[in-house]
Regions:
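Acidic, divalent-metal-binding catalytic cores of TOPRIM
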Residues: 1-285
Length: 285
């Protein structure tokens, strides 16, 4: 029986929902639930209340300690209930929805003849990835802390609701190491000890995120799409996307969103989107 209701993060206006509505098959309702906190419980409770409905969830991958090569298909998401593995749904192969929106193939299809020259766009993406490599390594290291109430995995000014990013001059390796130190010091005042040494983790991930590292090779999977997008703002201006009044990066994203909204075959644009559509149709509990 195919999925009737697909829960996802965000709200009804979020770009996650708008993209998913273009991917899911007919008959599947996309239902945003806000924060990811309690996502598992929401799905299980909904199934108990509506036993005749097929309910599943799709969540962001976020940062994790798995640097395996991309598989271009959603990962299966399970919960352990009464000592049994129960399928909840899936999580994206890439970090978050922006990682898909800024992919060159999506940009080309969403913007059509208004798309920037793809070679120049790819150069802008590569440049952005190089600039945020250290910061990404720090965010991944902070995200690998597993105790309750882990530290916030970013810093800087709030660029849009929920997204913080430092000034460009604060992206150096030494800056990231210093910020991690401040976060560790703050947490040590609140807890007896950290369960992992975040700075050691940072050193390890730093190599993976640097040029030639496995995560850098696949930065559209492992780096934060929101960070990559924001760091491209000056390059996007050169490609014709002007501040008005939002930064050029958000103007660019809005053009992509509109292109997706006006297209009927969005689910065919990426192999992972095609596979998600299939998995929704084939889902079994």
């Amino acid at each position: 029986m195919p999925v009737n209701t697909l829960y996802c993060e965000g709200d009804i206006q979020s770009i996650d929902v708008q993209v998913l509505l273009k991917i899911v098959p007919n008959g599947c309702v996309v239902k945003p639930i806000g924060s990811k906190h309690g996502f598992r419980q929401r799905i299980l409770a909904a199934r108990e209340i509506q036993p005749n409905m097929m309910i599943a969830g799709l969540k962001d991958r976020d940062f994790d300690d798995d640097n395996s090569k991309p598989i271009n298909t959603p990962h299966e998401w399970y919960a352990t209930v009464k000592n049994q593995q129960v399928p909840l749904g899936w999580y994206w192969d890439r970090k978050e929805i922006e990682n898909y929106l800024i992919a060159p193939e999506v940009v080309k299809l969403a913007l059509g003849d208004k798309a920037p020259p793809i070679d120049k766009y790819k150069t802008a993406l590569d440049k952005s990835a190089r600039k945020i490599a250290n910061y990404t390594a720090a965010r991944i290291a902070l995200s690998c802390v597993s105790y309750p109430n882990p530290p916030f995995n970013g810093w800087g000014d709030e660029r849009e609701p929920g997204h913080f990013f430092p000034k460009e001059r604060g992206l150096k390796e030494s800056d990231c190491r210093s910020e991690i130190g401040h976060i560790i010091a703050h947490k040590k005042r609140a807890m007896d000890a950290l369960k992992i040494n975040i700075l050691d983790q940072f050193e390890q991930v730093l190599e993976e995120c640097g040029e030639g590292g496995e995560r850098f090779k696949h930065y559209l999977t492992f780096f934060a799409g929101k960070d990559l997008l924001y760091m491209m703002r000056s390059e996007l201006k050169k490609l014709g996307f002007k501040d008005s009044p939002q930064p050029a990066c958000y103007v660019f994203r809005e053009h992509i969103r509109r292109g997706i909204q006006s297209s009927s075959d969005v689910w065919t644009w990426l192999p992972e989107w095609q596979r998600l559509r299939e998995l929704i149709s084939e889902f079994r509990i």
